[in-house]
Amino acid sequence: MGFLVDTQKEGGGHSWGYVRSLVRRKQVDSANGQSHGHQLARALTVPHLVAIGVGATIGAGVYILVGTVAREHSGPSLALSFLIAGIAAGLSAFCYAELSSRCPSAGSAYHYSYICVGEGVAWIIGWALILEYTIGGSAVARGISPNLALIFGGEDGLPAILARHQIPGLDIVVDPCAAILVFVVTGLLCMGIKESTFAQGIVTAVNVCVLLFVIVAGSYLGFKTGWPGYELPTGFFPFGVDGMFAGSATVFFAFIGFDSVASTAEEVRNPQRDLPIGIGLALLLCCSLYMMVSIVIVGLIPYYAMDPDTPISSAFASHDMQWAVYLITLGAVMALCSALMGALLPQPRILMAMARDGLLPSIFSDINKRTQVPVKATVATGLCAATLAFFMDVSQLAGMVSVGTLLAFTMVAISVLILRYVPPDEQPLPSSLQERIDSVSFICGETTSSGHVGTSDSSHQPLIVNNDALVDVPLIKNQEALGCLVLSEETRRIVAGWSIMFTCVGAFLLSYAASSLSFPGLIRYPLCGVGGCLLLAGLIALSSIDQDDARHTFGHSGGYMCPFVPLLPIICILINMYLLVNLGSATWARVSVWLLIGVIVYVFYGRKNSSLANAVYVTTAHAEEIYREHEGSLA
């Protein structure tokens, strides 16, 4: 098909059409991209982004995790556990920084997956993130009233409107406080991004000040008492180095939240500069606070004597500072409020991005003309989260939050590899330009066998190309269809595509085998070997070939570029897959039900209403020419 990207096959029917729809990809938003009507307000700068990142990341978990992880895993080496977890989270942050600056549009990991991988994977990521933010926001809201009760001297001291109540005859405990707070935060978010971010900044500042008080006052007590927590016969690693790493895997989830910054990319004044800085500063500040609090608390009291529920408060109480308990509890409440804002902020933007692409009803894509935020999507998000928070104790579902985040982290790292080695070089054009496309095709001396170019259902790029057949997975064009790629370039892209596939499969096999301790050695060790070999082969191959020249110009050029590619994204993929396979079968069973619902919604609504359903794919080199011809004809 000449310059047109076409892998039309005879036969296959509807089943083949379903497969093709899964791999169609959209372009990075540009001047030629589709108009979205009213736009989001570009009002955010670096301080706003840091406030969003820190507020969404530092929840009340730090006030609890310190005691739990120190008692069960790391002991006095807790600060090192936080450091290792922070470095692991930083790998994902590097990947987010590059993609958010190159593709600065709402939707975060969903948006990047749609551009680099395909519609099917993007839908799964977006659907999983919807679950993550809904349950995450509800769980955070349910945790506020117990902390408020500590300030009021117990649950009996809480006003009736804030206290929990059990419905007579039913095993349901309603939480009015949680629902009220969700509605308050929803109202703030509807007022505008700048107003809601200002409020989050204030709440986050109070939380950070409380943590700084813990660090300063705790250090004073530590030097005064001689740091008894470090003078133990069990040493610095009472559970061994393995315990320290086990602690790192647990506290890694305390760093989840910085990805909320990427969801606001469309509202940042200078995304190419500010997004990488905002993500990096937020993660650095969170890691520093976590480590300093850990150093102080495990030094004030022996790790085995820590209260697993209120480790910081009990540590100060043991040194006759009962009044500090109220201040620390206030910090925990502020942390929960900030985390609630961080959970409810990204979801409307993901709903908006999916609705823009036609995968969800268009009502979610409406942007209020005055406040310049997706008010309808925000209200829908708030209603769902408030209902769950009011009626359900979602603490048992908290593990499902991690699935969405880790899937997003993994896909962002894979997207960086794709962008660097096999970036998409086709663009979807509206079918209204079919006549102009045919005209340019004729001028270029191209001929087609059918007289019309394929639509998106028949036009995508295959990952692996040989002389006999096309394996239809997106990423790479075949040379016959292009007629302009030399063999060496085609070979490079084929090798890169295979290598990325080997890397992902190897990381999964290695993670699964290493985590399956119940497997017989005859199965487990060979599986580890196969996975390790595939992973290493992919890494060596990607390190040995050149990256694609388009990596400098793909998307919005001039932004941040992730260092140490391909090593850094591959390590990121391995870490996230290891954490995913260790979430437990019960968590995966619950998530599978949600994903199955998502598949049904996509098959019966999203696939048919996708904005790419009737798109025509052409190579980037000819897309601009087609647009110029079209604009010239309108002049």
Curated annotation (Swiss-Prot):
It is found in: Vacuole membrane. It holds the Pfam family AA_permease_2. It is a multi-pass membrane protein. The chain crosses the membrane at residues 49-69, 77-97, 109-131, 172-192, 201-221, 236-256, 281-301, 325-345, 377-397, 399-419, 494-514, 525-545, 561-581, 586-606. Keywords: Amino-acid transport, Membrane, Transmembrane, Transmembrane helix, Transport, Vacuole. GO terms for cellular component: plant-type vacuole; plant-type vacuole membrane. The keyword Cytoplasm does not apply. One of its GO terms (biological process) is intracellular amino acid homeostasis. Expressed in roots, stems, flowers, leaves, and siliques. Residues 1-48, 98-108, 193-200, 257-280, 346-376, 420-493, 546-560, 607-635 are cytoplasmic. Its main location: membrane. GO terms for molecular function: transmembrane transporter activity. Residues 70-76, 132-171, 222-235, 302-324, 398, 515-524, 582-585 are vacuolar. Belongs to the amino acid-polyamine-organocation (APC) superfamily. Cationic amino acid transporter (CAT) (TC 2.A.3.3) family. Permease involved in the transport of the cationic amino acids. This is Cationic amino acid transporter 2, vacuolar. The gene is CAT2.
